[in-house]
């Protein structure tokens, strides 16, 4: 009987292969952990590391299984690429925290890598939303300009609102993108300060660098999440088919909880709740605070893996008729050309704005109103409302983005607007034709 394990039917054997590899890893890792416990005197530090390792072994397979399913059913790259990047956050966080818990001396280095990936996740979530909208609604700027003016949320409610349309879209994307620049920059500064001995992580004092970097990171992160929230508020109806609330909460909770619990632990050290009287096997109080943070993250990531399994499910992308290469799906996961293009676009937009040449609005605010322009304006807005009120896609498929769009079933605002425009011009010409005939 010929072997069926060929590259053409890789979907059938890739999942059993991953399961076998994971089981072998468990068989090797568990004895090593037991041997480590027997070799050392078991204390609080070692017990915490062992318990965190149990949660790590529970977390990794859940996350990797969802990632693998997305690779197997990689039918809509525009959406699944950012989803896969977001899903990698849980195993990276969990493994990073477990290593830092075991080796406190290198915690500063592995934790900074984890925090950089946090910014990367926020950027990819914004990319996930914009990719869906631009594929389903090609004239997204047109839709934004037709909407009512959105005011800022507190505490920015006193600031003038951003103009609807391209300005709002650009500033929301730029607000998220700035965090992906600020966070790696502050991470490099933190590493330099650690080498110079002036970082002093976990100690709230204006004589060290850690306090200032925490403030900068916090402000940048809050503004990025604010831009995400404002973007969702404006396009809530258009985003409803992909159920973004659960996805937004998953990203927001992981990012905010990990950050603020570090701040709370640092405050406990500052007020003396965590003191030098009980450092266990750690050398300093700050090392105790960092170890406690890493231990809690290992537990939280198990819960986050379960939440990601349901909120970022692969099931809407299952299309058995779609065949793809195993290597193409795997390599696409590491492709970052979209990030390069997005950064280039934002830089060009900033350059146009600085030079005073922004793009013209599709709906000018100051224009002479007459019967013809009013009719065209109302017709265009009707076209937008028609496209925006399209029924949600059937279960199991997200219609309207990627290569699943079919012109016969998914009309775009551009086509509808052209049809209305041609009909309007035709009606305008009818009286003149009749006068000629008479």
From Swiss-Prot:
Q: Where is the composition biased (Low complexity)?
A: 374-390, 404-413
Q: What are the protein's UniProt keywords?
A: Membrane, Phosphoprotein, Transmembrane, Transmembrane helix
Q: Where in the cell is it found?
A: Membrane
Q: Under the GO molecular function aspect, what terms does this record hold? A: transmembrane transporter activity
Topology of the protein relative to the lipid bilayer: Multi-pass membrane protein
Q: Which InterPro entries match?
A: Ostalpha/TMEM184C
**Which is a Gene Ontology cellular component entry for this protein?**
membrane
Q: Which residues carry this modification: Phosphoserine?
A: 422
Please list the tissues where expression of this protein has been recorded. Answer: Widely expressed with higher expression in lung, kidney, spleen, pancreas, thymus, prostate, testis, ovary, small intestine and thyroid.
Pfam families linked: Solute_trans_a (PF03619)
Q: Does the keyword Membrane apply?
A: yes
Outline the segment boundaries, as ranges, of region: Disordered: 355-438
Q: Where is the composition biased (Basic and acidic residues)?
A: 425-438
Q: Which chain regions cross the lipid bilayer?
A: 17-37, 48-68, 86-106, 179-199, 212-232, 254-274, 287-307
Q: Which domain of life is it from?
A: Eukaryota
Q: Which family does it belong to?
A: Belongs to the TMEM184 family.
Q: Could you tell me what this protein does?
A: Possible tumor suppressor which may play a role in cell growth.
Name by which UniProt lists this protein:
Transmembrane protein 184C
- Report the source organism: Homo sapiens (Human)
Q: What is the lineage of its organism?
A: Eukaryota, Metazoa, Chordata, Craniata, Vertebrata
């Amino acid at each position: 009987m010929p072997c069926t394990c060929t590259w053409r039917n890789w979907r059938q054997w890739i999942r059993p292969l991953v399961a076998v590899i994971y089981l072998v890893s468990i068989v090797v890792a568990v004895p090593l952990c037991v041997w480590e416990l027997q070799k050392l005197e078991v204390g609080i530090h070692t017990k915490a590391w062992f318990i965190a390792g149990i949660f790590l072994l529970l977390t990794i397979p859940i996350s990797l299984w969802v990632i693998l399913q997305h690779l197997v059913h990689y039918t809509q790259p525009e959406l699944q690429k950012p989803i896969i990047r977001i899903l990698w956050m849980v195993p990276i966080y969990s493994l990073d925290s477990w290593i830092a818990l075991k080796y406190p001396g290198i915690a500063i280095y592995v934790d900074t890598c984890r925090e950089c990936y946090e910014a990367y996740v926020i950027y990819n979530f914004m990319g996930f939303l914009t990719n869906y909208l631009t594929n389903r609604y090609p004239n997204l700027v047109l839709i934004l300009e037709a909407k009512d003016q959105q005011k800022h949320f507190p505490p920015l409610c006193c600031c003038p609102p951003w103009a609807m349309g391209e300005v709002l879209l650009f500033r929301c994307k730029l607000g998220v993108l700035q965090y992906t620049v600020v966070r790696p920059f502050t991470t490099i500064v933190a590493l330099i300060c650690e080498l110079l001995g002036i970082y002093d992580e976990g100690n709230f004092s204006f004589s060290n660098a850690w306090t200032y970097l925490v403030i900068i990171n916090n402000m940048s992160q809050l503004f990025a999440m604010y831009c995400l929230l404002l973007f969702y508020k404006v396009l809530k109806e258009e985003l409803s088919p992909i159920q973004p609330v659960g996805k937004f909460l998953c990203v927001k909770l992981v990012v905010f909880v990990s950050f603020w619990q570090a701040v709370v632990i640092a405050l406990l050290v500052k007020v003396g709740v965590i003191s030098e009287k009980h450092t266990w096997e750690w050398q300093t109080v700050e090392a105790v605070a960092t170890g406690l943070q890493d231990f809690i993250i290992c537990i939280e990531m198990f819960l986050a893996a379960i939440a990601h399994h349901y909120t970022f499910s692969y099931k809407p992308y299952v299309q058995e008729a779609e065949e793809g290469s195993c290597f193409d799906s795997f390599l696409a996961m590491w492709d970052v050309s979209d990030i390069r293009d997005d950064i280039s676009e934002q830089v060009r937009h900033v350059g146009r704005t600085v030079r005073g040449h922004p793009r013209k609005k599709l709906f000018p605010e100051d224009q002479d109103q007459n019967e013809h322009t009013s009719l065209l304006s109302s017709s265009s807005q009707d076209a937008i409302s028609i496209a925006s009120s399209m029924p949600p896609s059937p279960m199991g498929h997200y219609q309207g983005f990627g290569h699943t769009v079919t012109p016969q079933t998914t009309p775009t605002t551009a086509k509808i607007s052209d049809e209305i425009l041609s009909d309007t011009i035709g009606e305008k010409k009818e009286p003149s034709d009749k006068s000629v005939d008479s």
